[in-house]
Amino acid sequence: MLLFLTIALPMLGGAAMGLMRFSSAKSRGIYVETIVLATSILTWVLLLTRTDTTYVLCHMNSELALAFRVDGMSCIFAGLVSILWPLASLYGFEYMQHEERPNTFFSYYTMSYAVTLAVAFSANLFSLYVFYECLTLITLPLVIHKKDTMSIRAGRKYLTFSISGAALAFIIYYGTTTDFVLGGVLDAEKISGMEELLKFVFLLAFVGFGTKAAVFPMYAWLPAASVAPTPVTALL
């Protein structure tokens, strides 16, 4: 239950900003930082009291489910994110005083925190794929925040490069399970006779996730995305 609350708090808090009117930049900053800090505190409570329990959000069918789990890898990524986000927020308050639509910016900024944690806590490949794609979509408005020609062009490039991560779906199709299993998830019987195709599938997956992570030489979108407000660029 605490895991769901940790992800839901910044998502709902960020979404609510679209309906709120703040009397000043200070009141907006207090609201955002309170949600971000509370989320980070909940995250560290999860990390320090973690169990190997898998929490299922929903079943898509008998094999695919959106699920969360706090494991060793989750601790690394979620711990890092929970430190970076509050610090970037503090910088963002001052920065956005000179930008338009700060409410919209901090709304998507806060919701991006939720989706990033969902990626970190993903219990299986399907969940990782879904939330990684959601992260692309939820951060797109931040990249094109200025809504000028350069930012729109950068947003298109960002979207085109990032959506290529869908190649992961091919690997899931050949797997016996979508869980993260030490030693691999592929069924030798299912892939028999398709070894060459499988190599191509792995290449697509590497390119897809490598592009999202801006791994050399697939980083062309990252310099273009620098037109986004600096707090976003820092987190990207």
Model-derived regions: residue spans:
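Hydrophobic/aromatic residues within the transmembrane alpha-helices of Major Facilitator Superfamily
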Residues: 83, 90, 167, 207-213
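Divalent metal-coordination and catalytic microenvironments
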Residues: 10, 71, 124, 164, ...
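Helix-boundary and loop/linker segments of multi-pass membrane transporters
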Residues: 67, 151, 190-197, 224-228
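Alpha-helical multi-pass transmembrane bundles of energy-transducing inner-membrane proteins
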Residues: 104-194
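C-terminal ends of transmembrane helices
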Residues: 15-25, 86-99, 141-150, 154, ...
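Short helix-boundary/re-entrant hairpin motifs in multi-pass inner-membrane proteins
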Residues: 104, 154, 200-236
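Structural signature of hydrophobic alpha-helical transmembrane segments
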Residues: 1-9, 72-82, 125-138, 196-209
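Transmembrane helix-loop-helix hairpins at membrane boundaries of multipass inner-membrane proteins
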Residues: 1-5, 12-107, 181-192
